[in-house]
């Protein structure tokens, strides 16, 4: 054999079988950075149609987690696939840099501002801390193979961005959407600040649930309203609440105008009580109160009780019964304790009736000094004292510990309160902002489509947006308000423009350093500077204006796509929509795509306490970023994304299949020069033409899946192509021709041309997902080419040629089915020790007329398709008794061991081996391939 070994075209490539990604990827990243790859991509797309994916900024605090990785990888896949489709798709990563979490970290290090350190120094420390966090996260994101302008990202703390945030607010003000008001807002007593909706989490909490009687000022008159005259007992209206601490701020009792309310007399412990309850809740209440007996004296509609007055249970004033649409009968009594300073519904109904917005609670959650009974007590600790006082006053009908869902601070994980404070708001209704936003939502493509109804409900129900915070590290609300009237300065918009110019030069500290007289002159004494800062959701929500509209690489194009986790419907998607609609009347995006959260193999959230956290850094260090990227792409992101070591190992197995396919392609393109050796598709061997045609059809499907952001379909189709059409069929069949045909002959060059086309297409298909591997393949592909696959477009060399004489896809699919049946019978023969390998087999195919015509069409080349040394086709009716039935009714098979000698070079068993004097160990075909013009192949 040694004489003939060197006549074979054995595969050869520098592309290793093992990816060794964890070690090789960092080397590739160094080259990408050194070569300025991102800029090369930008230069390759000058003048093309822009596609703008705007990066929602992660918070500059802590290490990235698996959810961050999912988000960045999905974005990168889209940007790379859009670039491959010819778009100019810049990617500018960003970071959210202001706000409370950074303040808390800096406080731990240097103390609170104004104590050991000035506010200005504190801000500088916050800026430094945020910059350090950005650097750490940036390295981790780059390691994932995400291409972008990493050296010039946007930071919400950049002076220019801070200035643009102020300019955006001035436009909101100019359009009439800002107002100041005393309103109940989510308030964290630990933060000492208002919280945005997105900063509130709901957790279970145990609270005292109490039923409290408010006695009527004139019980007889109330009884008369029910049609009961000369009634001698006191009549009370009963509320049920889980926040006893809010009772000092009670200013009304809300009832539903449409509900029936009953006057109920009941006896407990020998004492008669008369109470007003929603009729449908009477039985439940009587059971709860432990009534020994009860009777309903009369019923009336709630509307008849409007403005009836009742005594506060422990304060020296009375309160009205008022009508509210927020009253339900899900629980309680059908009467709602109403404290306008401590609840949004209470506030709204209170405004209608002109109620006082009482707020006896300070920033720290402690009752103010003038609060009767409870001064100096923390509200949650005061609950028990309120209950005790109610009991003492005879107003407590029932008390029980009650477990329920309650709002908590996202940062401190502690219960929060609703508290009325003077704040700045973007009004949802003053200038039809809500209506405009709802109209805009309909113009946007939401992916998945349930995102639309989700954000619609949120916009329909959301209160005015409280955009002010009482913090140190944030973009200032750069307003001057009159010291007496609290009115905004009439020139606020132009003043803000001047302040923004200063901030652009000096950063936000410029506002606190500013002497009002510099801008206001003599008016300065009449006005004071606002000291509040902006909600950080305003910072990030305005980046469509402060970043995208401001940076030249976006060409003033506007944003095509926002892509974030599904929690951002109430976060970044919402804040961006509100600000953009308030500024321009239009939404800031055309498409919004959301992905699910990552959970472990059992569907649980990632948690350090459970020990199920999978850190992206560990995955890249062990398996490589391409394995993580393949998992992200292969997972349907519309739901929860399940990840575990086992799942990642499965991704690694799938990756190996793709890598092995790429290696086969490269190894068999050894010595192929497309400039000189490429065979035109119409001149190819029929099977090669089929392979190119399949690749062309697949490319269309893959491009379509990329365009629809269905990356799991891309990976499914790719895996099927590598495993079935290539691995189990085409590549298996062509090995013989590739290795044994004449090196320069048509049979081999046809095959190599098909492999070249497939490799050129496939390297582009995988580039958005398996970026490192695609680069590795690209560097080893034959022919002259640009430095990087990432500057390319989808491969144009695939032609879906259909010649009149061509064998159809259906023909080859039938042949694949026949081949599978033959393989089964040969495998059984091997198990029975009748044959060794398939080349030791002679197969006889007994086929019906239709199948016979197909099988004989390719003549002697059928044996190459079946990988046997001999293949005979005979009529089905002539099937011998030993013929094996197959799953095809049209086919029976007989497999026998060949008696012919084995060719030393190609290993086929042929009758002529031993008859050729010059080459006694070779078959005719091999002699022709060594000494002659090479064998002729037409079909396979």
UniProtKB/Swiss-Prot annotation:
It comes from the Bacteria. Its main location: cytoplasm. Its cofactor is Zn(2+). Pfam families: Anticodon_1, tRNA-synt_1, zf-FPG_IleRS. A motif ('HIGH' region) lies at residues 58-68. ATP binds at residue 608. A motif ('KMSKS' region) lies at residues 605-609. Zn(2+) binds at residues 903, 906, 923, 926. Keywords: Aminoacyl-tRNA synthetase, ATP-binding, Cytoplasm, Ligase, Metal-binding, Nucleotide-binding, Protein biosynthesis, Zinc. Its EC number is 6.1.1.5. Signal peptide: none annotated. GO terms for cellular component: cytosol. Monomer. Catalyzes the attachment of isoleucine to tRNA(Ile). As IleRS can inadvertently accommodate and process structurally similar amino acids such as valine, to avoid such errors it has two additional distinct tRNA(Ile)-dependent editing activities. One activity is designated as 'pretransfer' editing and involves the hydrolysis of activated Val-AMP. The other activity is designated 'posttransfer' editing and involves deacylation of mischarged Val-tRNA(Ile). IleRS has two distinct active sites: one for aminoacylation and one for editing. The misactivated valine is translocated from the active site to the editing site, which sterically excludes the correctly activated isoleucine. The single editing site contains two valyl binding pockets, one specific for each substrate (Val-AMP or Val-tRNA(Ile)). This is Isoleucine--tRNA ligase.
């Amino acid at each position: 054999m040694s004489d003939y070994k060197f006549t074979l075209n054995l595969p050869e490539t520098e592309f290793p079988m093992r990816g060794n990604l964890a070690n090789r990827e960092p080397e590739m990243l160094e080259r990408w950075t050194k070569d300025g790859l991102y800029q090369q991509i930008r230069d390759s797309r000058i003048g093309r149609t822009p596609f703008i994916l705007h990066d929602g900024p992660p918070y500059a605090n802590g290490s990235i987690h698996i959810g961050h990785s999912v988000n960045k990888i999905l974005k990168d896949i889209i940007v790379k696939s859009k670039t491959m489709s010819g778009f100019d798709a810049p990617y500018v990563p960003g970071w959210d840099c202001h706000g409370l979490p950074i303040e808390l970290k800096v406080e731990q290090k240097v103390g609170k501002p104004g104590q050991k350190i000035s506010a200005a120094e504190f801000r500088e420390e916050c800026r430094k801390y945020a910059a350090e966090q950005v650097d750490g996260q940036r390295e981790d994101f780059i390691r994932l193979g995400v291409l972008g302008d990493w050296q010039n990202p946007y930071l919400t703390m950049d002076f220019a961005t801070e200035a643009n945030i102020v300019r955006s607010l001035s436009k909101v003000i100019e359009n009439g959407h800002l107002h100041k008001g005393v309103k109940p807002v989510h308030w964290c007593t630990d933060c000492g600040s208002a919280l945005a909706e997105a900063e509130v989490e709901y957790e279970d909490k145990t609270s005292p649930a109490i039923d409290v009687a408010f006695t009527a000022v004139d019980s007889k008159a109330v009884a008369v309203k029910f049609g009961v005259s000369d009634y001698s007992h006191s009549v009370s209206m009963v509320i049920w609440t889980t926040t006893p601490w809010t009772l000092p701020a009670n200013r009304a009792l809300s009832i539903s105008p449409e509900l029936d309310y009953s006057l109920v007399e009941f006896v407990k412990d020998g004492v008669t009580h008369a109470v007003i309850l929603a009729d449908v809740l009477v039985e439940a209440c009587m059971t709860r109160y432990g009534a020994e007996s009860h009777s309903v004296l009369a019923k009336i509609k709630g509307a008849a009780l409007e403005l009836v007055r009742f005594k506060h249970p422990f304060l020296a004033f009375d309160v009205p019964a008022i009508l509210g649409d927020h009253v339900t009968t899900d629980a309680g009594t059908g009467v709602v304790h109403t404290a306008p300073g401590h609840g949004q519904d209470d506030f709204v109904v209170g405004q209608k009736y002109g109620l006082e917005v009482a707020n006896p609670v300070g920033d720290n959650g402690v009752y103010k000094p003038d609060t009767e009974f409870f001064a100096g007590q923390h509200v949650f600790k005061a609950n028990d004292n309120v209950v005790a006082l109610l009991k003492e006053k005879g107003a407590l009908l029932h008390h029980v510990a009650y477990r329920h869902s309650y709002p908590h601070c996202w940062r401190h994980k502690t219960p929060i309160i609703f508290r009325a404070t003077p704040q700045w708001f973007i009004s949802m209704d003053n200038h039809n902002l809500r209506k405009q936003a709802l109209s805009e939502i309909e113009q946007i493509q939401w992916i998945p489509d349930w995102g639309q109804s989700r954000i619609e409900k949120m916009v329909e129900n959301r209160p005015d947006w409280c955009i002010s915070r009482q913090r140190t590290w944030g973009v200032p609300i750069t307003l001057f308000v009159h010291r007496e009237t609290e009115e905004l300065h009439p020139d606020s918009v132009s003043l803000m423009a001047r302040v923004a110019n200063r901030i652009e030069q000096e950063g936000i500290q410029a506002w606190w350093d500013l002497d009002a007289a510099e801008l206001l002159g003599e008016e300065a004494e009449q006005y004071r500077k606002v000291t509040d800062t902006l909600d950080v959701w305003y910072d990030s929500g305005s980046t469509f204006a402060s970043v995208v509209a401001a940076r030249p690489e976006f060409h003033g194009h506007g944003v095509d796509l926002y892509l974030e986790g599904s929690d951002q419907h109430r976060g970044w998607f919402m804040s961006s929509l509100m600000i953009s609609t308030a500024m321009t009347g239009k939404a800031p995006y055309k498409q919004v795509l959301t992905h699910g959260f990552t959970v472990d193999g059992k569907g649980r959230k990632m948690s350090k306490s459970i020990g199920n956290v999978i850190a992206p850094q560990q995955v890249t260090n062990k398996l490589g970023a391409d394995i993580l990227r393949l998992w992200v792409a292969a997972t349907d992101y519309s739901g929860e994304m399940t990840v575990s070591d086992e799942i990642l190992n499965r991704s690694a197995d799938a990756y190996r299949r793709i890598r092995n396919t790429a290696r086969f392609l490269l190894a068999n393109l050894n010595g192929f020069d497309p400039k000189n050796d490429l065979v035109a598709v119409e001149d190819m061997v029929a099977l090669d033409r089929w392979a190119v045609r399949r690749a062309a059809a697949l490319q269309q499907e893959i491009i379509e899946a990329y365009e629809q952001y269905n990356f799991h379909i891309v990976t499914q189709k790719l895996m099927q192509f590598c495993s079935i059409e290539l691995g189990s069929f085409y590549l298996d069949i062509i090995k013989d021709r590739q290795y044994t045909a004449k090196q320069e002959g048509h049979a081999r060059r046809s095959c190599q041309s098909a492999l070249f086309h497939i490799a050129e297409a496939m390297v582009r298909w995988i580039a958005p997902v398996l970026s490192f591997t695609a680069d590795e393949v690209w560097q080893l592909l034959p022919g002259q080419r640009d430095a990087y696959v990432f500057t390319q477009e989808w491969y144009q060399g695939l032609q879906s040629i259909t010649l009149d004489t061509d064998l159809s896809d259906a023909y080859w699919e039938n042949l694949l089915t026949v081949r599978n049946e033959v393989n089964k019978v040969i495998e059984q023969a091997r198990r029975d020790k009748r044959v060794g390998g398939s080349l030791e087999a002679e197969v006889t195919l007994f086929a019906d007329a239709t199948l016979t015509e197909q099988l004989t069409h390719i003549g002697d080349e059928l044996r190459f398709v079946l990988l046997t040394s001999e293949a005979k086709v005979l009529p089905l009716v002539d099937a011998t008794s030993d013929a094996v039935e197959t799953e095809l009714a049209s086919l029976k098979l007989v497999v026998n061991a060949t008696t012919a000698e084995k060719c030393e070079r190609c290993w086929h068993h042929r009758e002529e081996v031993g008859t050729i004097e010059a080459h006694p160990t070779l078959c005719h075909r091999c002699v022709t391939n060594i000494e002659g013009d090479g064998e002729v192949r037409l079909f396979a």
